[in-house]
Curated annotation (Swiss-Prot):
Listed cofactors: Mg(2+)
Top-level lineage group: Bacteria
EC number: 3.6.1.23
Transmembrane feature ranges: none
An MF annotation (GO) of this entry: identical protein binding
Cysteines paired by S-S bonds: none
Listed name of the protein: Deoxyuridine 5'-triphosphate nucleotidohydrolase
GO biological process: dUMP biosynthetic process; dUTP catabolic process; protein homotrimerization
Short motif Motif 5, important for activity, span: 142-152
Length: 152
């Protein structure tokens, strides 16, 4: 059975002027989130800003979390990514979804009201329960770290 997540519309334009978040295709993992702005916002190279979505969610289920991710086209074509690289939404958070947008590109970029600026996915959560041990069971890799497995 598919899980349902409560969404609270904070801005009356959402669902009318600005479409509700949607999956672009039947195979899409991420919901597109839109900039719920009154006016366009220009981001100079290197600038960051917080952009409201006009939405709040309450996941409520502690076995789930949401992640906000950049849209691949904005990042690749314009250098527009998330200021915190990935946004994590805990199951007990109930506030507005805000997108930290960073222009890592070389040119100014204008975010238009209603523009799709990020995507959100839901992921399972596993919380660690730590055990103090003297040693781990041996593996082929052992303590090999950065670059240990080679490039080819």
């Amino acid at each position: 059975m598919m899980k349902k997540i409560d969404v609270k519309i904070l801005d009356p334009r959402v669902g009318k002027e600005f479409p509700l978040p949607t999956y672009a295709t039947s195979g899409s993992a991420g919901l597109d989130l839109r900039a719920c702005l009154n006016d366009a916002v220009e981001l100079a190279p290197g600038d960051t800003t917080l952009v409201p979505t006009g939405l709040a969610i309450h996941i409520a289920d502690p076995s789930l979390a949401a992640m906000m991710l950049p849209r691949s086209g904005l990042g690749h074509k314009h250098g527009i990514v998330l200021g915190n690289l990935v946004g994590l939404i805990d199951s007990d958070y109930q506030g507005q979804l805000m997108i930290s947008v960073w222009n890592r590109g070389q040119d100014s970029f204008t975010i238009q009201p209603g523009e799709r600026i990020a995507q959100m996915i839901f992921v399972p959560v596993v919380q660690a329960e730590f055990n103090l041990v003297e040693d781990f069971d041996a593996t082929d890799r052992g303590e090999g770290g950065f670059g240990h497995s080679g490039r080819q």
